[in-house]
């Protein structure tokens, strides 16, 4: 019986699962062609009825059969339940190793039958490519086309991939393509369809961890760069506590009175807060760069550039820059070339991006701790899926040491002990710097290790390292969750091992390319390879490393063998694979007797969920495993929340420095501290959402109007509509005036704006009724526009339509960019309203609305002015 929190629904899920499984005997008798034909039948059925629930059992059973034929895997009932939950627009919480990749395919196939496109969103390109490759093999049996969005693709290729039934892509590529589509000048440049259904893998990482970071497309702004250098000099002359304080909880700097005066003296200015030249933002950013943003933790220096490191995943974020001058401050600190500060051209948060979908769901192993936020903001319920086998992971109590030095020594000694007995160990660190510190200590202890952090030189080996982290005598150091999404299999992954060994061996004996001389191939495998060396390898002609790698990949992926050479290599691969399967199985049994994979955490994160992600690397498919955190009172979390008190307590008890504290009370205190931080960041994200919702509504209004104009082939009506609206708006002001001279000025402004070159008889116009003036101006507008259209058509047919669209899109884009900047300034300053007993959010909404109305008015008037009054330079030769 499934152990469900949602026990009242279990019978409903079991009933559907039984229906799906009952169809196995039907579909396993179908030929490949008959199975493929089922897709069109289901499409016809779903289009006719629009009832997805009725065909769900059939669709899942068909996909289940395709998975079995392509991979040989039989889906567990819990995977079917996970897919049902995804189809209901909920989040399926499934533990590591439970087969989330295949679960997503079931739901994706069902929803692809609507012919509207399904997006499967992953956190990085490696996972997107890996999953898309597997999906192509499976859906080849069902006549479903799989797309993959690659960072290097041009727009036409992207358009083709988005038009597929199911498209795999990263969250950042999805967001940037959305923004680029809403900046396109030609409708042919649009790559995306309307958003229909998305399944987000590691949904908590995207919707929670990255919620505070908006996606931004930016362009250069004209700012001076010397201020950053000057501010960096000032920051280095200021001292903590005497001139400023660090707010570690909020990651902020508080400049005190002494620091303000000292800064003003150094800069030789009277006011650090002068509105005309506010130095304060440069000084605060320089101090943040000095004290809060740490090299090899928050960023790395790569090719003379500052590259951000994601605080949650440890991944480097190429192309991303901190805004508001912070990135420039860090460039000044690191003595790198300071790049021009950018202005925002388009932006959107992941919160609002994914709310654009008609239907949304996701998967993760850790969502329960953020359940309230996911439901409140995204209307997504979290359903915990039971594991297929009983979870045998043992989470040991935290060990807390007095200093960081002692903690790292203890971690290294623990790794040494595990290496001595052969137990595979995964150590999670919070920064690149700390991962390299541990690596250095292990090197001194002569303990071999694999280093998995997001430094560029280590990225290429990420999947190889994490895949083999479950082998005997393997110590793996991983920065945060680098390698997340790749299973750690006890005893090793025989497919990867066989491919690697075969590729290295062939490269070596044929002297084709450089090979990894440090990679150790087992004696049994080397014997097999050497025994078939002469007969099957040397006689092959024109083998190169690409052929070898591709041939082996084709076998792993069950692709067709196309030539005799590949066929020979495939036979060798199968022999090596079978031997590795035997070796890995035997090794797994030995590791289980040692206690399974051992996961060591070296610092508690601000979120319990991130800790759980690290722990979750152990306990795959019922494997015996354990985890433990090694902490110190100098860790950030403990330093902020009572580390000094615990240190005094240890001092009073005369506890030896090398002796750790192991206490359930301390564990509860740490969990309590994490809950406080989680609550704080939840409030931050909630506030961000509330404020961004205002801008999002305006963004949608602008983007809908822009797309309507972009796709339109006839924009004359829009121009006239803008002109008539402008006339009406200006006549409102005209009718409110009592002064004749002011009324005359307004009429003159209208006529000038619309290029209505007629003689104004003040007495006649001023004595007209409101509706008569409006009718008269509307009539003159159309006459003048007809004349201008006729003139431009004589110059070149279709020219007027091109000009209309160009002016419309150009002015919408320019006005929107300026509007974003004004909204950003408004958001920064609005907090001060709370001191005047005003609700900042209400004030923000009111002022943002006024700014939006002003922007719309500006767009209309500028487009009309350019269309009616611009002069064209005619090229006589063309």
From Swiss-Prot:
Q: Which residues hold ATP?
A: 79, 97-101, 487
Instruction: Give the main localization category.
Output: plastid
InterPro entries for this protein? Helicase_ATP-bd, P-loop_NTPase, SecA, SecA_CS, SecA_DEAD, SecA_motor_DEAD, SecA_preprotein_X-link_dom, SecA_SF2_C
Chain ranges passing through the membrane:
none
Q: Which UniProt keywords apply?
A: ATP-binding, Chloroplast, Membrane, Nucleotide-binding, Plastid, Protein transport, Thylakoid, Translocase, Translocation, Transport
User: Which Pfam families does the entry link to?
Assistant: P-loop_SecA (PF21090), SecA_DEAD (PF07517), SecA_PP_bind (PF01043), SecA_SW (PF07516)
Instruction: Identify the EC number(s).
Output: 7.4.2.8
- Protein location: Plastid, Chloroplast stroma; Plastid, Chloroplast thylakoid membrane
| Gene Ontology cellular component terms for the protein in this record | chloroplast stroma; chloroplast thylakoid membrane
> Topology relative to the membrane, per the entry?
Peripheral membrane protein
Q: What class of enzyme is it?
A: translocase
Family membership, please give it. Answer: Belongs to the SecA family.
Q: What does this protein do?
A: Has a central role in coupling the hydrolysis of ATP to the transfer of proteins across the thylakoid membrane.
Q: What is this protein called?
A: Protein translocase subunit SecA
């Amino acid at each position: 019986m499934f152990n469900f929190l949602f026990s009242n629904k279990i019978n409903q899920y079991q009933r559907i699962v039984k229906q799906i499984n009952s169809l196995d005997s039907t579909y396993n008798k179908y030929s490949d062609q008959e199975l493929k034909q089922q897709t069109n039948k289901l499409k016809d059925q779903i289009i006719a009825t629009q009832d997805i629930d009725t065909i769900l059992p059939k669709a899942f059973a068909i996909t289940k059969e395709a998975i079995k034929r392509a991979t040989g895997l039989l889906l567990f009932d819990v995977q079917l339940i996970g897919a049902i939950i995804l189809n209901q627009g909920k989040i399926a919480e499934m533990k590591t190793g439970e087969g989330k990749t295949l679960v997503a395919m079931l739901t994706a196939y069902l929803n692809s039958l609507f012919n509207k496109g399904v997006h499967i969103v992953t956190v990085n390109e490696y996972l997107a490519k890996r999953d898309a490759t597997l999906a192509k093999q499976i859906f080849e049996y069902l006549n479903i086309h799989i797309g993959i969005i690659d960072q290097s693709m041009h727009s036409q290729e992207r358009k083709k991939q988005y038009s597929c039934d199911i498209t795999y892509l990263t969250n950042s590529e999805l967001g940037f393509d959305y923004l680029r589509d809403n900046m396109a000048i030609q409708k042919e440049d649009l790559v995306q369809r309307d958003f229909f259904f998305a399944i987000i893998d590691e949904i908590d990482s995207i919707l929670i961890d990255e919620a505070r970071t908006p996606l931004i497309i930016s362009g250069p702004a004209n700012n001076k760069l010397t201020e950053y250098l000057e501010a960096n000099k000032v920051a280095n002359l200021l001292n903590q506590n005497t001139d400023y304080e660090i707010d570690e909880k909020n990651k902020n700097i508080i400049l005190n009175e002494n620091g303000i005066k000292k800064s003003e003296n150094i800069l030789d200015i009277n006011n650090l807060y002068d509105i005309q030249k506010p130095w304060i933002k440069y000084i605060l950013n320089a101090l943040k760069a000095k004290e809060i943003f740490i090299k090899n933790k928050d960023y790395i220096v790569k090719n003379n550039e500052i590259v951000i490191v994601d605080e949650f995943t440890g991944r480097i974020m190429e192309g991303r820059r901190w805004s508001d001058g912070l990135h420039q401050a860090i460039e000044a600190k690191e003595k790198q070339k300071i790049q021009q500060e950018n202005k925002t051209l388009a932006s959107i948060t992941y919160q609002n991006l994914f709310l654009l979908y008609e239907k949304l769901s996701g998967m993760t192993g850790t969502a329960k701790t953020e359940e309230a936020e996911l439901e409140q903001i995204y209307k997504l319920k979290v359903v915990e899926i039971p594991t297929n086998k009983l979870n045998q992971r043992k989470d040991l109590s935290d060990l807390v040491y007095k200093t960081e030095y002692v903690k790292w020594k203890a971690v290294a000694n623990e790794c040494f002990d595990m290496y001595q007995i052969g137990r595979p160990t995964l150590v999670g660190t919070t920064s690149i710097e700390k991962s390299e510190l541990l690596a250095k200590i292990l090197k001194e202890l002569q303990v071999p290790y694999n280093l998995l952090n997001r430094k560029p030189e280590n990225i290429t080996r990420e999947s190889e390292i994490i895949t083999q982290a479950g082998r005997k005598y393997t110590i793996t150091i991983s920065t945060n969750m680098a390698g997340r999404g790749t299973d750690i299999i006890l005893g090793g992954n025989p497919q990867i091992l066989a491919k690697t060994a075969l590729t290295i061996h062939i490269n070596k004996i044929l002297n084709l390319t450089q090979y990894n001389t440090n990679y150790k191939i087992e004696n049994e495998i080397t014997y097999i390879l050497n025994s078939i060396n002469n007969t099957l390898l040397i006689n092959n002609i024109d083998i190169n490393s690409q052929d070898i790698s591709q041939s082996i990949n084709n076998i792993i992926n069950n692709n067709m063998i196309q030539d005799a050479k590949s066929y020979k290599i495939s036979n060798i691969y199968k022999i090596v694979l079978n031997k590795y399967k035997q070796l890995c199985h035997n090794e797994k049994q030995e590791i289980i007797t040692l206690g399974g994979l051992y996961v060591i955490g070296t610092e508690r994160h601000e979120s319990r969920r991130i800790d759980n992600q690290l722990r979750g690397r152990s306990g795959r498919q019922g494997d015996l495993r354990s985890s433990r955190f090694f902490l110190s009172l100098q860790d950030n979390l403990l330093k902020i929340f009572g580390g000094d008190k615990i240190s005094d307590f240890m001092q009073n008890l005369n506890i030896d420095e090398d002796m750790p504290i192991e206490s359930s009370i301390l564990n509860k205190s740490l969990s309590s501290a994490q809950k406080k931080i989680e609550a704080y960041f939840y409030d931050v994200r909630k506030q961000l959402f509330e404020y961004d919702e205002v801008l999002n509504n305006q963004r949608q209004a602008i983007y809908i109007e822009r797309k309507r104009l972009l796709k339109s082939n006839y924009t004359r009506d829009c121009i006239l509509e803008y002109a008539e609206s402008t006339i009406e708006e200006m006549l409102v002001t005209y009718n409110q005036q009592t002064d004749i001279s002011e009324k005359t000025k307004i009429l003159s402004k209208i006529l000038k704006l619309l290029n209505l070159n007629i003689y104004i008889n003040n007495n006649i116009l001023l004595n007209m009724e409101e509706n008569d003036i409006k009718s008269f101006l509307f009539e003159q507008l159309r006459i003048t526009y007809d004349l201008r259209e006729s003139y431009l058509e004589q110059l070149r047919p279709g020219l007027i339509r091109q000009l209309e669209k160009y002016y419309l899109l150009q002015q919408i884009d320019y006005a929107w960019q300026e509007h974003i900047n004004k909204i950003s300034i408004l958001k920064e300053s609005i907090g001060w309203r709370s001191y005047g007993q005003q609700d900042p959010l209400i004030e923000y909404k009111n002022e943002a609305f006024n700014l939006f109305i002003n922007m719309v008015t500006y767009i209309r008037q500028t487009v009309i002015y350019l269309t009616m009054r611009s002069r064209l330079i005619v090229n006589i030769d063309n």
